[in-house]
UniProtKB/Swiss-Prot annotation:
Subunit structure as annotated in this protein's UniProt entry: Homotetramer.
Pfam families per UniProt: GFO_IDH_MocA, GFO_IDH_MocA_C
EC numbers, comma separated: 1.1.1.18, 1.1.1.369
Keyword annotations of the record: NAD, Oxidoreductase
Entry's Gene Ontology BP terms: inositol catabolic process
Protein name as it appears in the record: Inositol 2-dehydrogenase/D-chiro-inositol 3-dehydrogenase
Role of this protein: Involved in the oxidation of myo-inositol (MI) and D-chiro-inositol (DCI) to 2-keto-myo-inositol (2KMI or 2-inosose) and 1-keto-D-chiro-inositol (1KDCI), respectively.
Family designation: Belongs to the Gfo/Idh/MocA family.
Reactions it catalyzes: myo-inositol + NAD(+) = scyllo-inosose + NADH + H(+); 1D-chiro-inositol + NAD(+) = scyllo-inosine + NADH + H(+)
Gene Ontology molecular functions: inositol 2-dehydrogenase (NAD+) activity; nucleotide binding
Keyword field contains NAD: yes
PANTHER family: INOSITOL 2-DEHYDROGENASE, PTHR43593
Length: 344
């Protein structure tokens, strides 16, 4: 029997998930959609030949008896409300980041899930499902390089739009590193600091680009994360972990190598969609499989979403103050202590 899924938000990422569930993955079926633009929602049903009902709002979709699970792919500020409604209805919910736009909102979701007493919420941090990151995690967990000491990473985009602001470098871009690195080394963050190197000529007048974020963990690991969103040459994700006994590095995406005209070259991807398309597939398949096989989700938790929110808030404060800022987490609920979200 297929997992019956309702989608809240039929924009770009919503359409991608609808397409992969309908045409690529196993075990799931889209039975309901809703969007603030009802015509757009109806068009998605037509375009993908869905046997799905268009609902006027998230309340009615979540309440539908034939909806087992919900995907929240709407506008970020609307996420918290939809997720809370899904939990209260005892529906499984996959929420694209951000889980909520504030740390307080994330904590409200955490508290509601704890009250439910069941893992219902999965947050869309897809890098945990990328094969390269999985290999890094396995190397670290198996102590291949001993204890991690330092991490060097970079998040580079060829270009960003005119509406991209300085704080978005953290809130929209670095947030993926914030989650992935915390997961990789299983160590909470202690403090953050933001440094602005010389500004790139490619950056718009209102944007500080590039930026370097220095993160210190409670265990003493120091992370330096470069964010450069107008690098021009491609979409480039780097991660190198320096341990006591060696170094492990994120592998480059698979690509042919070309020897021609006295040159040796490989391609660099130009967008995030191609770079992490497989991770998105594995992520949603895991959401479906975990519910069907275990009766609960097993991916990134609401608590992980809370950690990301608190850390990005601290980074934004550090952008403004120029000082080292603390990452002040509340005590982790016992409910989340026993869950592991490593993709095997």
């Amino acid at each position: 029997m297929k997992l019956r899924i309702g989608v809240i938000g039929t924009g770009a990422i919503g359409k991608e998930h609808i397409n992969r569930i309908t045409n690529k993955l196993a075990g799931g079926e889209i039975v309901a959609v809703t969007d603030v633009n009802q015509e757009a929602a109806q068009q998605v049903v037509t375009d993908y030949s869905l046997n799905a009902k268009v609902y006027p709002d998230d309340d009615s979709l979540i309440a539908a008896e034939n909806v087992d699970a919900v995907l929240v792919t709407s506008w970020g500020p609307a996420h918290e409300s939809s997720v809370l409604k899904a939990i209260k209805a005892n529906k499984f919910v996959f929420c694209e980041k951000p889980l909520a736009t504030t740390a307080e909102g994330c904590m409200r979701i955490v508290n509601e899930e704890v009250k439910a007493g069941k893992r219902l919420v999965q947050v869309g941090f897809m890098r945990r499902y990328d094969s390269g990151y999985v290999q890094l995690k396995e190397a670290i967990d198996n102590r291949v390089i001993g204890e991690p000491l330092m991490i060097h990473c970079a998040h580079r985009n060829p270009v960003v739009g005119d509406n991209y602001t300085t704080d978005m470098a953290v809130v929209d871009t670095l947030v993926h590193e914030i989650d992935a690195l915390h997961w990789l080394i299983n160590d909470d963050y202690e403090s953050v600091q933001v440094i602005y190197p010389k500004k790139s000529k490619n950056a718009l007048p209102h944007l500080r680009d590039p930026q370097i974020v220095i993160i210190e963990t409670k265990g003493g690991v120091v992370i330096n994360a470069e964010i450069y969103v107008n690098c021009k040459y491609g979409y480039d994700i780097q991660c190198e972990i320096v341990g006591e006994d060696g170094i492990v590095k994120l592998p480059e995406p698979s690509s042919i190598s070309l020897r021609k005209d006295g040159k040796f070259s490989t391609d660099i991807l130009m967008d995030w969609q191609r770079r992490f398309v497989d991770a998105y597939d594995v992520e949603i398949q895991d959401f479906i499989d975990s519910i069907q096989q275990k009766g609960e989700v097993s991916g990134p938790t609401a608590w992980d979403g809370y950690i990301a929110a608190v850390t990005t808030d601290a980074c934004v404060k550090a952008q403004e103050s120029g000082q080292k800022e603390p990452v002040a987490l509340q005590e982790k609920p016992e409910f989340y202590q026993t869950f592991t979200t490593v993709k095997k």
